[in-house]
């Protein structure tokens, strides 16, 4: 009854107007699953590879080749298989690809099918996706990391860090956390406007004001938290995504906006000072993806009091994560389904992290769609944290809205992670 009888891939648009892959899976009993694949702007060198067309169409970014793979090779390989055999289906696709980085079939083709299969199987089981994937213990609503000021690769301003985030750790529910974030977001917008800055939003819905450095951005956020009636550090904590790989050149961290260069030790000490001066509880990619020595120094320096998240460092890859655990590097992993390219491998990365005492943060990409799968996966894995952009753009708010629905559906079983999500608080 849950055998796969049809798979349809198509080319749709993501939130940046670039093509991406969407996949429909139909089962023998009529159950249906649909998934759309996200795409990143700042990508790690060790990520699974998307299949893009090249040429002039869509400026080379078309995905007709990936769609052809979905409708051809992948359908031929898994047609008739039981959709409830997720691990077997994912492994079949990984083996069919045969490469280390999914470069033959394309991670965008494989992931679209993997997620759509899970959704179809969930529908066949009569269960919401978070319950189907996570089982009876899936009940923790994640603390959102809300990206409200953008810099780096996500903005055209002098700020070298990519994201400045707020975390409503003092809220009592996801519904209340979203309200906290919205009120700070709109307060920040007014304060930026009053100070003469533009308030256009970037790829992830955050503002991209022309501020001179990270401290200026943090000061604006601190003032906005207080003006909105909240206590920084108590109601709302702060987070950074440095995306340090983007400005790591010849062994140093080159801050073009500030016209400063810091060696790895100076970079770590700079981050430590920021975490001391502001209620910063999480720092993502504070060091470059292959600067293992710098990562180790940073972890030894502040890893006992600040969550240090590996994104480009780990790329949702369990093997790289195990290397980090062995070396004592970072203490958290950012989880992006398209970095690794299948649902099974994503779940394995979260499990590997949790077994080692590392936290996990479910995450979107800067190129998103209205697909809200990651909201369900955040609850399914009980990871307790989600990063899905600001309080603007429907491709971001779709995930918050889905979390609100899940919380309502869970009723008294629902628990908002709050401060407990960050083990060091």
Curated annotation (Swiss-Prot):
Residues in the signal sequence: none
Protein's pathway: Carbohydrate degradation; glycolysis; pyruvate from D-glyceraldehyde 3-phosphate: step 4/5
Any one annotated GO CC term: cell surface
Keyword Transport among record annotations: no
Keyword annotations: Cytoplasm, Glycolysis, Lyase, Magnesium, Metal-binding, Secreted
Cysteine pairs bridged by disulfides in the record: none
Cofactor(s) the record lists: Mg(2+)
SUPFAM superfamilies associated with the record: Enolase C-terminal domain-like, Enolase N-terminal domain-like
Gene3D superfamilies membership: Enolase-like C-terminal domain, Enolase-like, N-terminal domain
SMART domains: Enolase_C (SM01192), Enolase_N (SM01193)
Cellular compartments annotated: Cytoplasm; Secreted; Cell surface
MF terms in GO: magnesium ion binding; phosphopyruvate hydratase activity
PANTHER family according to UniProt: ENOLASE (PTHR11902:SF1)
UniProt-recorded name of the protein: Enolase
Gene of this entry: eno
